[in-house]
Amino acid sequence: MKLSHLDEKNHPKMVDVSDKNITSRMATASGVIYMSQEAFDVIKNNTAKKGPVLQTAIVAAIMGAKKTSEIIPMCHPLMLSKIETDIVEFVKECAFKLIVTVKCEGKTGVEMEALSGVSIGLLTIYDMIKAIDKSMRITDIVLESKEGGKSGKFVRY
C-alpha cells in the first residue's frame, strides 16, 4: 500500500485535494478520562480552583478541532460548519466520556478534527484537575463514525 503523504523520494508531502469534489463530511470521535473519586467530585460539584472544568473542556474541544491543521502537519485547513460536543458521566467508574462531532462541506474529511477535539478536551480536564489527581488516565480515543467522501460511511459498532 502506497502512503499518500509520501512522494516518490519518500519525502513527506501534503496531499493535493484540488481535483476532489466538495461533499458533506461528518465525523464523530470519543475518548474517556478516568480519575479518583475526589477529582470526580470536584468536577461534579464545580469546585475546582481553576474554574468550571467540563465547560472549559467543551470550549477547548471546539478550539482543538478548529486548530487541527496547525498542529497535525499534513492536515488541510478546513472551513468547519459545525462542532458539537457531549459529555457522558460514568459515576461508578469516576470517569467522563467526551464525544465530539465535526461537520464541513469540503474536499477532505474531518476525522482528525474530531479526534483532535476529543484529545484537547480531555487534556484540558487533566490540566485543570492534575493538582488533585496526577494518576488520571486518558484512554480509548477513537473514531466512532464518519460520513462522506470516496471511502463512504464508517461506523465503529
From Swiss-Prot:
Transmembrane segments: none
EC number: 4.6.1.17
GO biological process: Mo-molybdopterin cofactor biosynthetic process
Root EC class: lyase
Annotated InterPro entries: MoaC, MoaC_bact/euk, MoaC_sf, MoCo_biosynth_MoaA/MoaC, Mopterin_CF_biosynth-C_dom
A Pfam family per the record: MoaC
Catalyzed reactions per annotation: (8S)-3',8-cyclo-7,8-dihydroguanosine 5'-triphosphate = cyclic pyranopterin phosphate + diphosphate
Pathway in which this enzyme or protein is active: Cofactor biosynthesis; molybdopterin biosynthesis
GO MF, one annotated term: cyclic pyranopterin monophosphate synthase activity
Catalytic site positions: 127
Record's keyword annotation contains Lyase: yes
Positions contributing to substrate binding: 74-76, 112-113
Keywords carried by this UniProt record: Lyase, Molybdenum cofactor biosynthesis
Function description: Catalyzes the conversion of (8S)-3',8-cyclo-7,8-dihydroguanosine 5'-triphosphate to cyclic pyranopterin monophosphate (cPMP).
UniProt cross-references to NCBIfam families, sorted A to Z: moaC, PRK09364.1
Matching PANTHER family: MOLYBDOPTERIN COFACTOR SYNTHESIS PROTEIN A
Family statement: Belongs to the MoaC family.
Assembly and oligomerization: Homohexamer; trimer of dimers.
Name used for this protein in its record: Cyclic pyranopterin monophosphate synthase
Organism of provenance: Campylobacter jejuni subsp. doylei (strain ATCC BAA-1458 / RM4099 / 269.97)
